[in-house]
Amino acid sequence: MKFMGANELREKYLSFFESKDHLRLQSFPLVPKNDKSLLLINAGMAPLKPYFTGLEEPPKRRITTCQKCIRTGDIENVGKTSRHGTFFEMLGNFSFGDYFKSEIIPWAWEFITETLGIPKDKLYVTIYLNDDEAYDIWTSKTDVDPSRIFRLGKDDNFWEIGVGPCGPCTEIHFDRGEGKVETVEEFLEASDADRIVEFWNLVFTQFDKDEEGNYNELAQKNIDTGMGLERIATIMQGVDNIFEIDTVKNILNKACELTNAKYGEDKDKDVSLRIITDHGKSVTFLICDGVQPSNEGRGYVLRRLLRRAARHGRLLGVKGIFLNEMVDAVVENYGEAYPELKEKADYIKKIIKLEEERFNETIDSGMDILMSYISEMEEKNEKVLSGAKAFKLYDTYGFPLELTQEILEEKGLELDIENFNKEMKEQRERARNARGESSYMGSEESPVNKVDASIVTEFDGYVNLELNSKVIVLGNNEEFKSELKEGEEGFLLTDKTPFYAEMGGQVGDRGNITSETGMAIVTDCKKNVGGKFVHYIKVIEGSLKEGQEVKLSVDASRRSNICKNHTATHMLHEALKEVLGDHVNQSGSYVDEERLRFDFTHFAALTEEELEKVELLVNEKIMTVSVVDTKEMSLDEARNSGATCLFDEKYAEKVRVVSVGDFSKELCGGTHVANSGEIGLFKIVSESGVAAGIRRIEAVTGISALKFMELKNNMLKEAASMLKCNEKDIAKRIAAQAHELKEKDKEIAELKAKLVQGAEDDILKDKVEINGVELVTAELKDVDGNSLRDLADKVRNKLNNGIVVLASDNGGKVNLVAMATKNSLANGVHCGKVIKEVAAVVGGGGGGRPDMAQAGGKNPENIAKALEKAKEVVELLVK
């Protein structure tokens, strides 16, 4: 066989199916759109589910893709084996009610044996036990040796998940060994031994399984095939694992270079290098597709992968930041197929660098705490770390659960995962109750998401805010209805509408719908999971009926304010690019009638000067009264014209480009003002950080901006009145008062210090002796942490062989400190252990070294009990 690189294989596959009249689609982003069942895209067909289910019409009945995928189910095996990985590419061709078995089987054989040139005597085919049709096609329409076809049962060659669409499949296998297998038993044995490997699965979706277990023929039969690019690359390159194929090997070589480790010489180092290679690739693609590190959802998947790779870098001796340098190797090997990697490389590097820096801080503190837990377990001869302690590490210190588990496993210890999950569940319940979760659009099973795919609503609301239409669907949360009556709430679809459905960060329109028999208010307009325009309504008079002619009227004043904010968002985006640099890209937005919110990529808080420049630039462009122009063009034309595209969006071939004079040009389907002058005024309300490398600006326009300025002005007047000065002197007056307060605080601190001075002699009067070790405890009032440490140090200096534990109620908060003489340590004294137990009594925590430790608490009423606890702990330590 001729050697073929992974990039060449990808192109050959897609070109082959293009020659069979398939539409080639670019890979969908890893973040699913309108699919709450998936965290990340994990299969080639996953983003095409709406086409298979009939919720959406496909752009063509024949489609081919190379879909990037992430799977983390076997993450614990990644690195330990040579075939597990979290990132992979799935080659696929799909038919939605077009061709079926008699076409795809010979095409598959043609591609494998002719295009790729794989020897026929190295191939085997499996089919479902009873699929005679597939057997007949294989033997009549290809020249496969019939003795190389094996029939297998449901577990191997039938695809189904519960009830619903399902069907048999045929799989194509490659034999890495010598000789021929003659029987099913020999075939299965060779497969189990990894001598024979499956590399292409052709699924024939031809049945609909009902609740009774009956398999009913589908009217529309589909084809869904999947061939892992990495798997076929191992075959075409004559290697036996994914880390040896050209693209991945190049990235692994980069990992070796950055860690100064050699691959193939040490088993443990090889594991670390494979983890860094795989995870470095995954995090690059995830960040490119808009995922940000966080503690939940897909953001946590990213954080987990990144931190796992960073830790294995440390195991290889890397001291500083290095993972961001892996991006170059990923871009070099995947940049031609995924050009967005090249465009976002600098941004990806910065996000990784920020997260790795953050992790280095986390891992240092977290490792200290975990190792102290492990030391305690070893002292007590315990083998299981409590779930509560692991959860505290995770929740309070940001230490990843998986890292805790890995380190425990390395030490031969276990984790009480059941109680960890219990703690996690309780925390999620608290969070859920706090935010009051709701699902506005209902579940995928609700009627609103079961509207027939053939129903189409024409949007005619860019200019028209009122038009006549016909009701084609009515319903509520439980069922479709022919009529909705006064007082009832539900949803309504029409054949055309002026109502904009929430999309691209812009909220949906509100308004009303009237007919001869009644009237309803439109509380919102959204698209369902199938992309249909859905009007959410409440009938306030009479009734609305299916099939009726109705008049739809958008709230014009509200729409006008939304348009001002949306156009201003585009102008803000461009202004940020001009002031901060081209690395600025939209990360999210929200536009309603009151304000706008814009999230963007940047790596530091904006200075006051930068904010002023951005605000001034937007207002200058508003004053030019530039025409806001919209044009439809092809995606390539839009890109070539310099229009800004969002990396995580999937665009159609025809796109809408919105331009504000010669200042801003973006792809956008939203509604806008006719000219920039309509915005009137733009005012930034706030600037903040929302994630690593992501900043957020909130702003107002028009009358809202004037009201905001008026509010600020009134606040200034009120402040001037309270300070008894002119508005222009407010800053000076505040600075003067701040200086006065600082001086008074200094005087108070000096007075407190004088009160504490000399107190050590009084404290020493209560000294007790425990097995030859002196113990001094005392409760004080209104002594800050620094003064308490100074006092403890003075008391310690007057001890021969002992420990002092002091506690202070300082404004309702407890300060604790323990100090011990060096010779007392030999008697078993350990301040860190003492203070930990003492702090728990006052509702706090802390720790430290054997000779000095400090902590805090929130229950000063328990200080006396805490000091009694100190005595108990010292008695145990110095037995």
Curated annotation (Swiss-Prot):
GO annotation terms (biological process): alanyl-tRNA aminoacylation
CDD domains associated with the record: AlaRS_core (cd00673)
Cell compartments where the protein resides: Cytoplasm
Catalysis: reaction(s): tRNA(Ala) + L-alanine + ATP = L-alanyl-tRNA(Ala) + AMP + diphosphate
Superkingdom of the source species: Bacteria
One Gene Ontology term, aspect cellular component: cytosol
EC number: 6.1.1.7
Cofactor: Zn(2+)
PANTHER family: ALANINE--TRNA LIGASE, CYTOPLASMIC, ALANYL-TRNA SYNTHETASE
Function: Catalyzes the attachment of alanine to tRNA(Ala) in a two-step reaction: alanine is first activated by ATP to form Ala-AMP and then transferred to the acceptor end of tRNA(Ala). Also edits incorrectly charged Ser-tRNA(Ala) and Gly-tRNA(Ala) via its editing domain.
Family matches, as HAMAP family: Ala_tRNA_synth_B
Protein name: Alanine--tRNA ligase
Source species of the chain: Clostridium perfringens (strain ATCC 13124 / DSM 756 / JCM 1290 / NCIMB 6125 / NCTC 8237 / Type A)
The gene coding this protein: alaS
